[in-house]
């Protein structure tokens, strides 16, 4: 049996269609509404994870973090998990993604991380223009914005 952990019905549609055409039995665990009993052993099968860090943009705040706990449960019981906890960990952090890429000598754009508007402004003052900002967890390009100068960036933060 294939178990699909996800929180986005739209993304799953082509997989659902293909698995049905193939006659592959599967069960969906929609993690925004389903929670397995973590006090018992998980069912036998293959667990395919389609979780996205951008779940909050669909009203599913906290679902990736809950899914991380479920993945630990599955992995602790030796289940076959495709896109398991290591993949989800990378999905949840641009900083960790970039660090993993750099560990394999893959080029990444010059990247800074900040937690507050004050930190963003401090970093931006020392950056050459133009520069691009991106949210850590946004999805589908949400929050990607180009700034041609510091003043425009400062105005955007004040808005």
Each language-model region and where it sits:
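Active-site nucleotide/adenylate-binding loops and adjacent lid/helix of ATP-dependent enzymes
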Residues: 1, 86-159
């Amino acid at each position: 049996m294939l178990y699909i952990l996800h929180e986005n019905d739209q993304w799953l549609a082509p997989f659902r269609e293909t698995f049905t055409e193939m006659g592959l039995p599967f069960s969906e665990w929609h993690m925004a509404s389903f929670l397995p009993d973590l006090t018992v052993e998980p069912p036998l099968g293959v667990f395919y994870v389609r979780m996205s860090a951008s779940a909050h943009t669909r009203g599913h705040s906290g679902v990736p973090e809950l899914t991380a706990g479920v993945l630990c449960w599955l992995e602790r019981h030796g289940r076959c998990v495709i896109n398991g906890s290591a993949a989800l960990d990378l999905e949840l952090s641009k900083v960790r993604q970039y660090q993993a890429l750099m560990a394999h000598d893959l080029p990444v754009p010059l990247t800074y991380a900040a937690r507050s508007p004050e930190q963003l402004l401090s970093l931006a003052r020392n950056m050459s223009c133009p520069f691009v900002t991106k949210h850590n967890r946004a999805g589908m390009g949400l929050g990607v914005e180009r700034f041609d100068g510091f003043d425009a960036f400062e105005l955007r933060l004040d808005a």
